[in-house]
Amino acid sequence: MSTSRLQQQFIRLWQRYNGQSTETTLQALAEVLNCSRRHVRSLLGKMQHAGWLDWQAEAGRGKRSQLIFLRSGLALQQQRAEELLEQDHIDQLVQLVGDKKAVRQMLLSQLGRSFRQGKHILRVLYYRPLENLLPGTALRRSETHMVRQIFNGLTRINEENGELEPDLSHHWQAITPLHWRFYLRPAIHFHHGRELEMSDVISSLTRLIPQPLFSHIAEVRSPTPYVIDVYLHSPDHWLPWLLGSVHAMILPQEWETQPDFHRQPIGTGPYSVIRNHHSQLKIQAFDNYFGFRALIDEVNIWVLPELSEELVYSGVQLQADDTGKNELESRLEEGCYFLLFDQRSPQACTPEIRRWLCELITPIALLSHADPFYQRYWSPAYGMLPRWHHNRLTTQEPKPEGLNELTLTFYSEHSEFDAISQTLTQLLAAQGVTLKIQVLDYTRWYQGDAQSDIWLGSANFYLPLEFSLFATLYEMPLLQHCLSEELHQDIESWRNNTLLMADWSQRLVSQHQFHPLFHHWLELYGQHSMRGVRMNTLGWFDFKSAWFTPPEA
């Protein structure tokens, strides 16, 4: 039996008898430990040898023997808990301790900086698993950030100013409006050791052609080593930014044959995935990264939904609650929570119904009915961005005839959506309308793969907003089901850089196709000793740029 298993058995005994010496029998102990009398005798011998207890046996069946505790179960439990923390076995820690508040405090005390075996380790507490890290698929906000730490594109979009920077390619040029050329760096390696080849770039980009944003790509070639040519059906001013977006990250061409690639992907980025399961994501600095090596050697993201629900609202936590050296960075998101009206629905495609719903479901009405807890994190939205005021308040019209029931759909693992849907249910019930709730996984929501009248979601945009606002929405298949046919004309204007984003957004809002609800306050709780931490528009920070100052003497 392993030492950890023996410790667990001892703790069960200690808890059963409250650490008090007692007279008992082998049979009684067998019932406590759920094993045979013979096995109990073996366990007691090992515990006695370890110096945890003294077992004074009396001969004869049914005779009561003396059990004397020499070690505190709490002390042993604390020792075992520290071992599990050190080994990042958080799920086992929860089973060992049992008390969620106690586990939370233990975890918070270990967040942030750790120095182990000469390595700097950053620990972060998060509220849900990050199970899909495959570029070109439906990615939520935090998955998008992680993918940027693991992969590279031909170009890179600077998170702070939106400027385009070299990445896998060091230079690029538009030879003609329909022909772009990218010059790649040599000797770039994937995390599994193989050198990047031009065929990896070609396969990564051509796999995206079926997607709306990339459908104008005609062909991708490599005329000479370390040169990639991209040919287009129609000009695209934004192509270099598009090839730096998270969907266009470069994968090894054999990615489909790699086991569990969506969960444990292989890229060329500053961090490689070491472990990714339901309770932990561990990424490690890639020593052969072609850029500056990351200063933090390892990032551990501990996933505990039942212990970190508040992080759904408050953001990323890198430090304990009770330290006086916390530093808080906050920003209002570039984006919003919103409602979409499905054009496939007979009710939602009716302008009068959409207008009536938007007049009823105002941000102020939702806030006034919501739990006060949320008011700290929600700011009323009157446009897609905080500085836009496109949703004009109008007088409430009478309810349209025949409107008695609606279906609202949102994605799972987002408790704020539960709160919003409850408030919507109350508002509509007061008007005689029953709201049916439908919860999907994120991929089905992203695809619009369900029958629904209204869809609840959120979007986070990044710099440059002129690129990301349209790109983020247009690449989402759900939007194709909810916006008008004009969207296909808008893509050409956007690619020509003649589509004014404020006007486009105002049109969607005023036509009651896209209904903003809230802007969310993003918060990042850091450590005083951390440097290089600047929160991005996704509520995270670039891991490879962060570092720790030495502890004070």
From Swiss-Prot:
Domain of life: Bacteria
One protein family per Pfam: SBP_bac_5
GO biological process: negative regulation of DNA-templated transcription; peptide transport; positive regulation of DNA-templated transcription
Residue intervals of the HTH marR-type domain: 1-113
InterPro entries: SBP_5, SBP_5_dom, SgrR_HTH_N, Tscrpt_reg_SgrR, WH_DNA-bd_sf
UniProt region (Solute-binding), positions on chain: 163-494
GO molecular function ontology, one term from the record: peptide transmembrane transporter activity
DNA-binding region residue numbers: 26-49
Claim: Transcription regulation is one of the keywords in the record: yes
Function comment: Activates the small RNA gene sgrS under glucose-phosphate stress conditions as well as yfdZ. Represses its own transcription under both stress and non-stress conditions. Might act as a sensor of the intracellular accumulation of phosphoglucose by binding these molecules in its C-terminal solute-binding domain.
Name of this protein: HTH-type transcriptional regulator SgrR
Organism per entry: Yersinia pseudotuberculosis serotype I (strain IP32953)
